[in-house]
């Protein structure tokens, strides 16, 4: 498995050359870029064709892969116009992924709206249909739609159901290391259900509040070869924190066998 840095908080102030240089020097194989938040990396749908080509060239020259883009697109809207806005923006981000060499795009569910008279089954069907529409555009462009286990769509049964309803091979799950998955100190039961669909992982602080050693063992046993992206709070000394993080990550990988 490989380690990436997600620029949700940590590293959001680094421009792209700095981000790629720091990630490579510290030992991160990839970066996952959060879009639509005016982060310093500047990789957004507003980039021109020439600017997108330059981003791809910079990443290739650095040896650090842009392993994905991370969006705020979600498909639970009660109003059709809002839903269509998110779908259309997803499609624009799919083009951006393909142009900069990012193989995947993170999206959400994100909430149920039973208080508005919409059943969970109805929302799951709506989300699945949106994923299907986006995935059919993404597949020929070599982009995977990565559905994060997030918000009301965790517990696992909801996100798995959505992926099954979407019925598209390039729709997958992002396992999000959520404390809600821990049952009796273990995530084994949840992992058993989601493992066939997981092709990306979001890590957080590698502390004992979540059974990370077990997660790394389960990933190893599953033959997981993908990225584990570190989604970390900001720090006044990010380089120092990331060096410690890389060292701890390597320890967990080594202990997993």
Each predicted region: which residue ranges?
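Histidine-acidic metal/acid-base catalytic patches
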Residues: 1-4, 12-29, 53, 60-62, ...
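Flexible loop residues that form catalytic
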Residues: 36, 74, 110, 206, ...
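Glycine-rich, positively charged N-terminal anion/phosphate-binding segment
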Residues: 42-58
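Conserved beta-strand positions in the central sheet of alpha/beta enzyme cores
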Residues: 32, 68-70, 106, 146, ...
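A short beta-strand-loop structural module common to alpha/beta enzyme folds
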Residues: 29-40
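Active-site acidic/histidine proton-transfer and metal-coordination neighborhood
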Residues: 21-24, 53-65, 75-173, 180-184, ...
């Amino acid at each position: 498995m490989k380690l990436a840095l997600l620029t949700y908080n940590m590293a959001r102030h680094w421009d792209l050359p700095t981000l790629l240089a720091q990630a490579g020097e510290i030992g991160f194989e990839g970066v996952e870029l959060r879009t639509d938040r005016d982060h310093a990396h500047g990789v957004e749908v507003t980039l021109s064709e020439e600017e997108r080509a330059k981003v791809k060239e910079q990443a290739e020259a650095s040896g650090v892969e842009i392993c994905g883009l991370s969006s705020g697109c979600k498909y639970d809207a009660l109003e059709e116009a809002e839903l269509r806005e998110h779908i259309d923006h997803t499609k624009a981000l799919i083009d951006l992924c393909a142009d900069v060499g990012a193989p995947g795009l993170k999206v959400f569910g994100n909430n149920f709206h039973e208080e508005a008279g919409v059943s969970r089954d109805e929302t799951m069907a709506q989300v699945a249909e949106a994923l299907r529409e986006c995935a059919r555009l993404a597949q020929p462009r070599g982009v995977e739609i990565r559905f994060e286990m997030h918000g009301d769509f965790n517990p696992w049964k909801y996100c798995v159901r959505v992926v099954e309803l979407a019925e598209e091979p390039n729709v997958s799950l992002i396992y999000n290391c959520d404390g809600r998955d821990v049952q009796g100190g273990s995530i084994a039961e949840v992992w058993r259900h989601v493992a066939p669909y997981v092709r990306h992982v979001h890590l957080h602080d590698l502390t004992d509040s979540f059974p990370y050693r077990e997660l790394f063992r389960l990933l190893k046993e599953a033959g997981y070869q993908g990225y584990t992206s570190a989604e970390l709070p900001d720090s006044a000394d990010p380089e120092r924190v990331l060096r410690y993080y890389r060292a701890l990550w390597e320890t967990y990988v080594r202990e997993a066998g």
